[in-house]
């Protein structure tokens, strides 16, 4: 009797597992092609996604480097309830036990490249449309180059040598690009080029709050050149 019960339970389990697999393993009903997505009506979605990558967390999103700059340089205290509270930043504060495998560093690196990837995708999509199809084309490309320049500036300031990819870089080539493919000065020049384009193509004012304008691009360009001129 006991064997029959165990057999029944095992059979029911196998039947349920098979049923679940059949239920979950469905063929896609439809796939969006590039022509479906890259349209004048949809292209702003690529731009908004790039802005969204800026985030608002002060530890590992690309908008602020205070734990990696101000805390390390004695301009700010880590804070918290003790040395074990966000211990990684305590190590930055005392310049001790700093390791390259800290999750916060990896998170910052990863999220900056998520933002760069979204900017590249947006620029590539915008380039597929004509100015007639999408009158804001140049302005939106300038916005994306401004935001991409910001992401790269953050990476360059913290890591110095980073792999450089833009909208013309095939995705399959990403793993093959060395962080020494560009020299220190070439990286600064590439970042500056984005802000130069932005300063030439952004309007003096923006109707929507949060979008960069010409003066912001000039200011960021000046900041990049100052950092570039500082030997370190």
Features from the language model and the residues they span:
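TPR/Sel1-like alpha-solenoid repeat signature
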Residues: 145, 218-224
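Short coil/turn linking the two alpha-helices of tandem helical-hairpin repeats
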Residues: 156-157, 163, 206, 227-232
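Short linear capping/connector segments at secondary-structure termini
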Residues: 29-33, 97, 167-175
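Conserved, well-structured interaction surfaces
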Residues: 44-48, 52-57, 82-159, 176-189, ...
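Membrane-proximal, proline-rich intrinsically disordered regions
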Residues: 20-68
């Amino acid at each position: 009797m006991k064997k029959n019960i165990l057999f029944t339970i095992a059979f029911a389990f196998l039947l349920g597992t098979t049923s679940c697999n059949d239920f979950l393993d469905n063929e896609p009903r439809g796939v969006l092609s590039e022509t479906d997505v890259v349209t004048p009506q949809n292209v702003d979605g690529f731009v908004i996604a790039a802005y969204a990558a800026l985030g608002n967390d002060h530890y590992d999103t690309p908008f602020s480097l205070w734990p990696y700059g101000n805390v390390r340089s004695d301009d700010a205290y880590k804070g918290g309830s003790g040395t074990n509270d966000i211990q990684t930043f305590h190590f930055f504060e005392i310049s001790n036990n700093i390791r390259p495998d800290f999750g916060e560093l990896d998170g910052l690196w990863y999220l900056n490249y998520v933002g760069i990837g979204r900017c590249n995708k947006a620029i590539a999509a915008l380039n597929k449309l004509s100015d007639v199809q999408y009158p804001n084309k140049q302005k939106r490309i300038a916005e994306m180059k401004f935001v991409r320049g910001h992401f790269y500036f953050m990476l360059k300031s913290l890591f110095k040598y980073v792999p450089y990819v833009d909208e013309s870089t095939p995705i399959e080539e990403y793993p093959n690009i060395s962080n020494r493919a560009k020299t220190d000065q070439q990286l600064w020049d590439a970042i500056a080029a984005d802000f130069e384009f932005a300063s030439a193509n952004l309007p003096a004012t923006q109707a929507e709050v949060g979008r960069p304008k010409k003066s912001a691009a000039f200011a960021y360009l000046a900041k990049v050149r100052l950092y570039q001129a500082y030997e370190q």
